[in-house]
């Protein structure tokens, strides 16, 4: 397996960059464009492996899609216009593709099957199957409740669906299924999650009512979706690696431009401010999705406590919060993050293992970590492993910048899932 030497940096990270398009929005723009009438034009599309899995699956479902770099044109087939695929739909490693497509396919007029790679095939899918069944969806899973999934498309009925897990993927699957149902559907969640699906559907013409006080969305089917132009903002989950690096690497001062500032995605920024980071934001646009430039510089950080109520807005960034804690003054505790155990890897375990290799004082807990911050670490093992997890690989690369010991990353290509140009962009700022 490939191994990459990681950079040790004492000069600091300086300059500015724009990160790739947001992964969540790229997925959803493709899918909603496919269900619309007319042409949807997507710019700054994320050309990562997960989003390409969605693109290829939609093509297999009869959708005409043309991509030139980050520019994508989708010729919609309407809400009921998808066609039966000739073979199982390959999801590769993409949980978002899988769960959202389960919702879309549940109301179509044919049977389809979703399959994935070894990692995705271990991830739980009953959590989607159950809520969709409330609308009458017929979805078969393995005995373990995992892929392959067989979706028997047929007419759906509106329902009231109360989600037990705060998950934007599950919520979105129900909303996309509800577009095809007879009668309205109301889906409620225990805590607010990212709302890109709702924002995009409203822009395309769907009839959605959002009740923020009740954390619920009501979908009234029958509205005609019409193709739109979508400019995908920079992915805050990708920007997060540079914001954290800028805070913890000495002599750093950097700006990440045109980042999505959707309030459901700015949890890391709030944590950085709470920890005392020297950070500023210049909002540059506001419309379907607010965006702006975020500037950060080397900061003296204090310990932080993160609990379950904080988790939905920074679920993908929690490993980076753990890294901030490892560099801060004092003892930090992160809890309520059990959802990390069913990501591409068990991220609670793999982050703890990575930190122990680096010499970080970390205690793994069932739903998070207890971390004692230290100014310097004593590396125990130099070979760090991404375990095929894109976010773990990038976390290791950022952590390595603080090391005085040469470090190596096993399976660095995993970062291509969400950020193919990560190492090149790190080099632009001096991290090479």
From Swiss-Prot:
Q: What is its EC number?
A: 2.5.1.19
Annotated binding of phosphoenolpyruvate, by residue: 23, 95, 123, 169, 347, 391
Catalytic activity, reaction form: 3-phosphoshikimate + phosphoenolpyruvate = 5-O-(1-carboxyvinyl)-3-phosphoshikimate + phosphate
Amino acids binding 3-phosphoshikimate: 23-24, 28, 167, 169, 316, 343
Output the Gene Ontology cellular-component terms. cytoplasm
| Stretches that traverse the bilayer | none
Q: Name one GO molecular function term.
A: 3-phosphoshikimate 1-carboxyvinyltransferase activity
Q: Where in the cell is it found?
A: Cytoplasm
The active site of this protein is located at: 316
The cross-references to InterPro entries, in alphabetical order and at most eight, read: Enolpyruvate_Tfrase_dom, Enolpyruvate_Tfrase_sf, EPSP_synthase, EPSP_synthase_CS, RNA3'P_cycl/enolpyr_Trfase_a/b
Supply the Gene3D superfamilies for this chain: Enolpyruvate transferase domain
Pathway(s): Metabolic intermediate biosynthesis; chorismate biosynthesis; chorismate from D-erythrose 4-phosphate and phosphoenolpyruvate: step 6/7
Q: Which domain of life is it from?
A: Bacteria
Q: Which UniProt keywords apply?
A: Amino-acid biosynthesis, Aromatic amino acid biosynthesis, Cytoplasm, Transferase
What biological process terms from GO does the record include? amino acid biosynthetic process; aromatic amino acid family biosynthetic process; chorismate biosynthetic process
Against PROSITE patterns, the record matches this protein to: EPSP_SYNTHASE_1 (PS00104), EPSP_SYNTHASE_2 (PS00885)
Similarity section? Belongs to the EPSP synthase family.
Q: How does it assemble?
A: Monomer.
Q: What does this protein do?
A: Catalyzes the transfer of the enolpyruvyl moiety of phosphoenolpyruvate (PEP) to the 5-hydroxyl of shikimate-3-phosphate (S3P) to produce enolpyruvyl shikimate-3-phosphate and inorganic phosphate.
Q: Which PANTHER family match?
A: AROM/DEHYDROQUINATE SYNTHASE, PENTAFUNCTIONAL AROM POLYPEPTIDE
Its protein name is 3-phosphoshikimate 1-carboxyvinyltransferase
Query: Which organism is this protein's natural source?
Result: Limosilactobacillus fermentum (strain NBRC 3956 / LMG 18251) (Lactobacillus fermentum)
């Amino acid at each position: 397996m490939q191994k990459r030497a990681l950079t040790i940096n004492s000069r600091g990270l300086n300059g500015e960059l724009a990160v790739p398009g947001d992964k969540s929005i790229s997925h959803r723009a493709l899918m909603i464009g496919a269900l619309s009438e007319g042409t949807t034009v997507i710019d700054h599309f994320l050309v990562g492996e997960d989003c390409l899995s969605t693109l290829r699956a939609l093509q297999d479902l009869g959708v005409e899609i043309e991509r030139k770099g980050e520019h994508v044109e989708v010729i919609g087939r309407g809400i009921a216009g998808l066609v039966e695929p000739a073979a199982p739909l390959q999801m590769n490693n993409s949980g978002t593709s899988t769960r959202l497509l389960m919702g879309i396919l549940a109301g179509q007029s044919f049977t389809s099957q979703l399959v994935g790679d070894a990692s995705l095939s271990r991830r739980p899918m009953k959590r989607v199957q159950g809520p969709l069944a409330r609308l009458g969806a017929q979805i078969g899973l393995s005995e373990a409740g995992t892929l392959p999934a067989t979706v028997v498309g047929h007419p759906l009925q509106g329902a009231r669906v109360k989600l037990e897990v705060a998950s934007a993927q599950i919520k979105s699957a129900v909303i996309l299924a509800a577009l095809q149902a007879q009668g309205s559907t109301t889906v409620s969640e225990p805590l607010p999650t990212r709302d890109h699906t709702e924002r995009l559907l409203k822009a395309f013409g769907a009839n959605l009512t959002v009740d923020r006080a009740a954390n619920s969305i009501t979908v009234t089917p029958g509205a005609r979706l019409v193709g739109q132009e979508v400019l995908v903002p920079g992915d805050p989950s990708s920007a997060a690696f540079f914001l954290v690096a800028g805070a913890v690497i000495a002599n750093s001062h950097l700006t990440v431009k045109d980042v999505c500032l959707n309030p459901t995605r700015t949890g890391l920024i709030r944590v950085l401010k709470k920890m005392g980071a020297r950070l500023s934001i210049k909002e540059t646009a506001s419309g379907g999705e607010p965006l702006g430039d975020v500037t950060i510089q080397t900061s003296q950080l204090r310990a932080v406590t993160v609990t379950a109520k904080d988790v939905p807005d920074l679920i993908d960034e929690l490993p980076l919060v753990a890294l901030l804690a490892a560099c801060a003054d004092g003892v930090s505790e992160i809890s309520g993050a059990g959802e990390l155990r069913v990501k591409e890897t068990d991220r609670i375990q793999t982050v703890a293992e990575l930190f122990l290799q680096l010499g970080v004082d970390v205690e793994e807990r069932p739903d998070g970590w207890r971390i004692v911050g230290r100014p310097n670490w004593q590396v125990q093992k130099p070979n760090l492993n991404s375990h095929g997890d894109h976010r773990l690989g990038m976390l290791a690369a950022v952590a390595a910048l603080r090391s005085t010991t040469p470090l190596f990353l096993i399976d660095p290509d995993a970062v291509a899932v969400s950020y193919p140009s990560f190492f090149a962009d790190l080099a632009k700022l001096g991290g090479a």
